[in-house]
């Protein structure tokens, strides 16, 4: 069983909690992307990032001096968005840390796919960014099926806790009869079931923590996710879609 999650835009450098233990497997491709990004002018980079000057300028300055081999932070600690704060990996037990290194994978526009203890540096590049590289018109074409091949060398269930933007790098390449279970955290709004992005990110982080703490290796056991605000809805769920309803 493999679990996939999305990265976060907000990143930090943290070399104190845990050391980086492994190297990203597609570092050569990351170097290729870095070279392409460093050729962009400031206006081109700002357009690619869809952000204000306040965010674009420091990111552009950082881009010019990125070194992929120095000041590395384990990926699981480098991202500091809502999902990662609610996961709280810095307080995981050793068995929980071992679990995520074996089972959890972070999908990334810049690094492709990451194990939690792969050493990385801060970057800004979303998977849906319109960056052409060589013959590839965008990052989906650039990465192709490589993320899937690294995720599951042998067909096994995939637990999708990633956003659609990132899950699209895996779903088209599933082996015949291989299951990918989408985890849906939804709320009733005006009588309709909808997903609130912030609440979903919080719940995804909490679920990763739950899976790691309980060493979950059976897909059906995911339904027992213990959360004060969410309850598994068997009626609205299917074999490949587990729905959890917000209770407030």
From Swiss-Prot:
Give the domain of life: Bacteria
Q: Which HAMAP family match?
A: UPF0246
Which Pfam families does the UniProt record give?
Answer: H2O2_YaaD
Would you tell me the Gene Ontology cellular component terms? cytosol
Specify the protein name.
Answer: UPF0246 protein lp_0089
Q: Which family does it belong to?
A: Belongs to the UPF0246 family.
Q: Note the InterPro entries from the entry.
A: YaaA
Which GO BP terms apply?
response to hydroperoxide
């Amino acid at each position: 069983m493999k679990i996939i999650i999305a990265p976060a835009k907000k990143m930090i450098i943290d070399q104190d909690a845990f050391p980086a233990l492994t190297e990203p497997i597609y570092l050569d491709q990351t170097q290729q992307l870095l070279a392409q990004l460093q050729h962009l002018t400031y206006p081109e980079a700002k357009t690619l990032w869809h952000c204000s000057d306040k965010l674009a300028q420091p990111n552009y300055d950082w881009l010019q001096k990125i070194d992929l081999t120095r000041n590395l932070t384990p990926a699981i600690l480098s991202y500091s968005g809502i999902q990662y704060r609610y996961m709280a990996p810095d307080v995981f037990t050793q068995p929980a840390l071992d679990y995520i290194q074996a089972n959890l994978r972070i999908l990334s526009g810049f690094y492709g796919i990451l194990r939690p203890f792969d050493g990385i540096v801060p970057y800004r590049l979303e998977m849906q960014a319109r960056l052409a590289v060589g013959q590839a018109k965008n990052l989906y074409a650039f990465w192709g099926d490589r993320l899937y091949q690294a995720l599951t060398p042998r067909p096994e269930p995939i637990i999708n806790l990633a956003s659609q933007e990132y899950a699209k790098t895996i779903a088209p390449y599933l082996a015949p009869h291989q299951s990918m279970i989408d985890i849906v955290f939804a709320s009733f709004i005006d009588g309709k079931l909808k997903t609130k992005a912030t609440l979903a990110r919080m719940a995804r982080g909490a679920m990763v923590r739950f899976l790691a703490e309980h060493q979950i290796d059976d897909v059906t056991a995911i339904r027992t996710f213990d959360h004060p605000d969410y309850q598994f809805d068997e009626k609205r769920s299917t074999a490949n879609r587990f729905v959890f309803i917000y209770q407030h």
